[in-house]
């Protein structure tokens, strides 16, 4: 019988912070792309990218709450 790995959450805050950093990087790159190519993008493409950026912002907010929860539980 296999034994499950122990629940090691010691690096959760670091992992979550890395995810936040990457998400913010993607958000900023997307904004730069929209600004650089605004004339070439259709309004649908701009709307899709803007919507995706809004979801990224919501994700970052949720991840920040998760970091707070993790820090409080340690």
From Swiss-Prot:
GO BP, sorted A to Z: asexual sporulation; sporulation resulting in formation of a cellular spore
Species assigned in the record: Oceanobacillus iheyensis (strain DSM 14371 / CIP 107618 / JCM 11309 / KCTC 3954 / HTE831)
Annotated Pfam families: Tlp
InterPro entries (UniProt xref): SASP_thioredoxin-like (IPR017524)
UniProt protein name: Small, acid-soluble spore protein Tlp
Superkingdom classification of source: Bacteria
Family to which the UniProt record says this protein belongs: Belongs to the Tlp family.
Main location: other
Induction record: Expressed only in the forespore compartment of sporulating cells.
UniProt-annotated stretches for the region Disordered: 38-74
